[in-house]
């Protein structure tokens, strides 16, 4: 019996599955396999274009395929920048001020009150995206700092102006990463001054991207573990992350946390796990006076909210931070035990 005759006698679903696996290997689709009682093995297929439009945390092959796309494609100034993006790249603050005034003038002439016009212009600027991975405005400025480091101070001034103009700093690119996530991940950005600026403007250090990872996941994956400068940079970045409310136990879509990565490489890079354990001790000493997830103590006019079920977990106000939501996958095991 020939190979073709054998394939002809195979069930249709086997031929279809083989075809779809071949398509996935070529990067055209993503296959999700599941086993359902009474139905057996089923699979669902999502093409890359569909993955781009979804918002949920991805895992497995879907996560890897979107990651591959985002790391293989980037914003190229000559190809992707419009006129506004090009003058941002030049870094002239005076021109940005003039552009902003013109946008405000359009809104007020349309009948908006000053407060409404400020919000509308801020939303317009927040909504802007460039390139194949939908780079937002603060991410764009961070990228410019990598491309033209001599203009870095100019880009910081532009970012500061936009922050004062009430433009939110939490815009996400196609990977779900914010400007804050990019600028201290160490791959390739490491700019703690820009990170501090974005953090004070409301940036969330525990932001999870489309793969479910926080910046700490990237920091923990030190590419060159034998290079002292790489290890030192990663250690400093992790210290900044934790000291600004970062949590090392938030798991990605496949259940892996920064703590588990640091524990796995502790014999090669012991500094990272040591940083986490030092922060564990600091937060433990604070006891019930700090948030269970981020370790922040509330300000004088705020108070921590307790888990309604176990009364043990304490969290920041959900209107300010999503600490309880982020901690739930870990806390629910302890909560049920209680």
Q: What does each model-found stretch correspond to?
A:
Residues 76-85, 113-147, 171-186, 208-225, ...:
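Ankyrin-repeat boundary/"N-cap" motif
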Residues 91, 154, 187-190, 223, ...:
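Ankyrin-repeat intra-repeat helix-capping/turn positions
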Residues 95, 154-158, 190-194, 237, ...:
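Conserved ankyrin/ankyrin-like repeat signature
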Residues 98-119, 157-169, 194-205, 236-247:
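Ankyrin repeat domain, specifically the short helix-to-loop turn at the C-terminus of the second helix
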Residues 144-155, 164-165, 185-193, 200-203:
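Tandem repeat protein-protein interaction scaffolds
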Residues 229-338:
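Ankyrin-repeat-protein effector appendages
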